[in-house]
Amino acid sequence: MKWKALFTAAILQAQLPITEAQSFGLLDPKLCYLLDGILFIYGVILTALFLRVKFSRSADAPAYQQGQNQLYNELNLGRREEYDVLDKRRGRDPEMGGKPQRRKNPQEGLYNELQKDKMAEAYSEIGMKGERRRGKGHDGLYQGLSTATKDTYDALHMQALPPR
């Protein structure tokens, strides 16, 4: 039975000419022109919408007033100081984890502030504040350390370097 079906298929194939199926695919020029037209119309519409949003935003800008309840406020660079203080909470020591300082004068900061009039000089230096601490006699080593850092420094003992 197999031989009979195979022989019939071979005869039919020999007698009938082999024709290729026509492909009405993406290579048809009419379809390419149609797709180009759709893409052109899409580009024109998208450009028109973009320009409308861009030019309508400048007219609507005064309508959005800045306030306390606004989620995003624009930067106000008009009142910016050249050397502005970062931490507005005076009396907080960053080396003590933000705890309040126990000083006689809480307005006296830990660090020296830059002075605007001295910045005009090319090689001006920042002077050191006089420290009023009860030390162990060699306070020259501890300049600029807070009490918490000074205690840690005291606990560590300096070891002599081995000779080379």
Swiss-Prot record:
Phosphorylated on Tyr residues after T-cell receptor triggering by LCK in association with CD4/CD8. One of its GO terms (cellular component) is alpha-beta T cell receptor complex. It comes from the Eukaryota. Residues 83-111, 128-154 are annotated as: Disordered. It is a single-pass type I membrane protein. PROSITE patterns: ITAM_1. Residues 22-30 are extracellular. The modification Phosphotyrosine is found at residues 64, 72, 83, 111, 123, 142, 153. The keyword Zinc-finger does not apply. CD3Z is expressed in normal lymphoid tissue and in peripheral blood mononuclear cells (PBMCs). Residues 61-89, 100-128, 131-159 form the ITAM domain. GO terms for biological process: adaptive immune response; alpha-beta T cell activation; cell surface receptor signaling pathway; Fc-gamma receptor signaling pathway; gamma-delta T cell activation; positive regulation of protein localization to cell surface; protein complex oligomerization; protein-containing complex assembly. The modification Phosphoserine is found at residue 58. It is found in: Cell membrane. Residues 83-96 have a biased composition (Basic and acidic residues). InterPro entries: CD3_zeta/IgE_Fc_rcpt_gamma, Phos_immunorcpt_sig_ITAM, T-cell_CD3_zeta. Keywords: Adaptive immunity, Cell membrane, Host-virus interaction, Immunity, Membrane, Phosphoprotein, Receptor, Repeat, Signal, Transmembrane, Transmembrane helix. Belongs to the CD3Z/FCER1G family. The TCR-CD3 complex is composed of a CD3D/CD3E and a CD3G/CD3E heterodimers that preferentially associate with TCRalpha and TCRbeta, respectively, to form TCRalpha/CD3E/CD3G and TCRbeta/CD3G/CD3E trimers. In turn, the hexamer interacts with CD3Z homodimer to form the TCR-CD3 complex. Alternatively, TCRalpha and TCRbeta can be replaced by TCRgamma and TCRdelta. Interacts with SLA. Interacts with TRAT1. Interacts with DOCK2. Interacts with SLA2. Interacts with SHB. Interacts with ZAP70. Interacts (tyrosine phosphorylated) with SHC1 (via SH2 domain). Interacts with PTPRC. (Microbial infection) Interacts with HIV-1 Nef; this interaction up-regulates the expression of the Fas ligand (FASLG) at the cell surface. The ITAM domains mediate interaction with SHB. It is linked to Immunodeficiency 25: An immunological deficiency characterized by T-cells impaired immune response to alloantigens, tetanus toxoid and mitogens. Part of the TCR-CD3 complex present on T-lymphocyte cell surface that plays an essential role in adaptive immune response. When antigen presenting cells (APCs) activate T-cell receptor (TCR), TCR-mediated signals are transmitted across the cell membrane by the CD3 chains CD3D, CD3E, CD3G and CD3Z. All CD3 chains contain immunoreceptor tyrosine-based activation motifs (ITAMs) in their cytoplasmic domain. Upon TCR engagement, these motifs become phosphorylated by Src family protein tyrosine kinases LCK and FYN, resulting in the activation of downstream signaling pathways. This is T-cell surface glycoprotein CD3 zeta chain. It comes from Homo sapiens. The gene is CD247.
